[in-house]
């Protein structure tokens, strides 16, 4: 998946552990939403994290 246009958030990697502590590789995806925002005065559709939207770092068009 893409990364956040504002914060640069992207998916992170690690292990999931079973009860027996066996490791399996997995990834955690950031909560990204595709929104239209103004970039250089023009509307553009970009991936933005939900946290950036909630905190008001982005103004939707």
Curated annotation (Swiss-Prot):
One of its GO terms (biological process) is translation. GO terms for molecular function: structural constituent of ribosome. Keywords: Ribonucleoprotein, Ribosomal protein. SUPFAM superfamilies: L28p-like (SSF143800). Transmembrane segments: none annotated. One of its GO terms (cellular component) is ribonucleoprotein complex. Belongs to the bacterial ribosomal protein bL28 family. This is Large ribosomal subunit protein bL28. It comes from Geobacillus stearothermophilus (Bacillus stearothermophilus). The gene is rpmB.
